[in-house]
Structure formats: C-alpha cells, structure tokens
Amino acid sequence: MTNQTVRGTKDLLFDEWYKFKHIEQTASRISSLYGFLPVQTPIFEYTEVFTKTLGDSSDIITKEMYTFIDKGGKSITLRPEFTAAIVRLLIEKKLQAPIKLFSIGPAFRYERPQKGRQRQFHQINFEVFGIEDPKADIELISLAQHLLTEFGINKNVKLEINSLGDSETITQYREALISYLKKFQNDLSEDSQNRLIKNPLRILDSKDKTDKEIISDAPKISDYYTKESSYFFDQVLNGLQALGIPYTVNSKLVRGLDYYCHTVFEFVTEDLGAQGAVFAGGRYDNLVSSVGGKHTPAIGFAGGIERIMELINYAEKKERPIYIIPIGGEAEEHALTLASELRRNGLYVIYEYSGTLKTRMKKANQANAKVVLIFGDEELSSKTLKIKNMDTGEEKMIARDKTVENI
C-alpha cells in the first residue's frame, strides 16, 4: 500500500482547513440573506440521473464520470456536479416552486489535475426554481458578486455574460453554425469534429488554437435572437447596470453542459491560470420537464471552493490558550477536572501532562498562552491557584472557585 494521496485529491490541514470552513460558512450565511434553503444530496446517484440531464456530448459524460456497478448490479456514479442531483431531489420530494436551494459538498471528475482543478473538489451551489422573470437572473448574479466581495476578491474577478436565447434561437443558430463549421470540418480539432453534429455550440468554447481562428468569424448568436430572447437579455443587462455590477458580453460563452438557455455567465480571473472561472452558471428552463418533472424555469450557479481558496487571504484568528501546569501527584489528578471545567466555560485549554516546571513554561510560551495556571498539592489544599499573565509576567494567587472570572 502506498502512503500517498490518490492523484487529483489532497489532504486539508490546519490553516487550510480553517480557510475551507470560512468559505463554507460565508456562503451559507449569504445564502440565507437571499432566502435560500439548505439541502444535501448523496455523493452518488444512479448513473441515469446524470446521463439524462448533462447531455451525451458533454465532456463530463464522455470522459470524466466516476461510474461503477454496485453489488446489486446497478450503475452508480459519483456526483460530477450538483444541478442534476438537485433536479432529481426537486422531483422526487415534490418540492413546490418557486423555491431557492443551496448546497455544499464534494464532487468528482476524472480530469487532468492542475491549479484550481482536482479530481475530488468541493462546490457551493445555488439553484432557483420556478421563476421565469429575468429579475431572478439579476438577483442570482448579484448574490455571486456579493460573495466575491465578502471573500475580498471582487476586484480581480470579472463577470462575463452571454445569452443563448430560447429554444427557437438555439435551433436556428445551431443550424447556421453547423453550416459554417462544415466548411472547415477537416481543420477542426478531434473534439470539435465530434461535437459538430451533437453539440456544435460547445465548439465556441474550444481552447484549440486552430478552432479559435475558425470560430472567430463564425455567425454570432445575437443575430438569431427572437424578439423575446433579445428583450429578456436586455432586461438582465439593464438590471446589472442598475446595480452597478460591471460586465462584459462574451458572445463565445456557452458553458459546458447541454441544458442551458437564455442567460449564461462566468466570474473569471487571470489569477487561476487556465482554470479561470470562479463562479459559473446559467438558466435551464427546460431541464426539469426533460427528465419527467413539470415545466419549471430555473437558473443556478456553482463555485469551486478549492479555487476560491487559491484566491483569498484568510487566517483564522486563533484564540490564545490557557495553560495548566500541575505540580505533584494530587495536583496532577485534579488538573483534568480543572481543564474540563474551563472548557465547559468556552475556554481553550492546554493541559501539559508531564515535564519540569521550566520545560512546561517554555512550552506555554511557545504556544502563545494567554495565562498559565500553576498549582501544587499545597494550593490544592488551600483551594487556590497561581495565575501568571504571560504578556506582563504578573503573578498572583486567586481562589480556585474564581478561576474563570480571573482569566
């Protein structure tokens, strides 16, 4: 057995753990300000939960899912993203829309590990169901901006936004794009050739140099907007302007999954290298009905916690400990009782089990102790303690039953 983590996973220690929890807690707190309700789904689902929703041409389905057959012969997949599982939850539990749902947890994708991208990663996830009004899009993007501000990274993260329009827009644009790209079919990358028929819009998001040159002159989706699609997108952009949220319209932004329509957006930064998206999401009005639910317009976004951790400066404000140093047999026996009492009063206590007084005092100093409590058998008999302030060096005797008040 190899004593190392599996490639694409990482341990979380000490200060990094505090940073992780800070992100979780901040996201949870902000979600409640916007009326989101917390939910949690299992980390694995029946495989069809994802294959039905993510589209058979997406990279997640074709390359990245962790899928296995369980002992009952069922195909099971570790969650690669949240939306599919949340939609399953919405339908199975018969939740009444409109409703806003917030979730946090791990997800799994078989990808090439790099900065900001691991095979096990964690996401904060926001989904709004049952609201077709563009104000829902505006509010959700505003929430994302609010979070970035809370994390202190809003200045280096920029909003890119696009609209894929409604079903009619997507159908007409898809035909026009295929017609254009077929002229260059043999020059496209292998991935883009595979996508040409199944999901040509994904080619717009290609990172291949030749693909980029080809799509630079491709038809623009905005030329195919229906009147309704154009009005919807204008309403979203006007709302962002009213809130003072700067944005750039990126006509090549399509997102990586097949279920999106109308608004799609990413908050991006150059500080993460190739993995520039901090938050990403969009509208998916037809997804719920496509998997057997009622027609339920929806919009959502997710953010990778590990990516946010790469960007934020956060250090947990560490409480200084109370150090207990007993001297003598009876005092040693009583030390745990004292430590337990102080901890139940909300104090951080270190009880040093052994060593000379000099050694223990040195360790108390290294631990940046606030005060040291010293007592031997004599103090135990007189129900007193010596308390030493480690900042001033002041020492005094106090009554044992007044310990908490004197700290």
From Swiss-Prot:
Gene Ontology molecular function, alphabetical: ATP binding; histidine-tRNA ligase activity
Pfam families in the cross-refs: HGTP_anticodon (PF03129), tRNA-synt_His (PF13393)
EC number: 6.1.1.21
Any GO BP annotation: histidyl-tRNA aminoacylation
Cellular component, GO annotation: cytoplasm
Catalytic activity line of the entry: tRNA(His) + L-histidine + ATP = L-histidyl-tRNA(His) + AMP + diphosphate + H(+)
Nucleotide-binding found in the keyword field: yes
PROSITE patterns xref list: AA_TRNA_LIGASE_II
Localization of this protein: Cytoplasm
Enzyme class: ligase
KW NAD (keyword) present: no
Subunit structure: Homodimer.
Protein name (record): Histidine--tRNA ligase
Native organism: Wolbachia pipientis subsp. Culex pipiens (strain wPip)
Source species taxonomy: Bacteria, Pseudomonadati, Pseudomonadota, Alphaproteobacteria, Rickettsiales
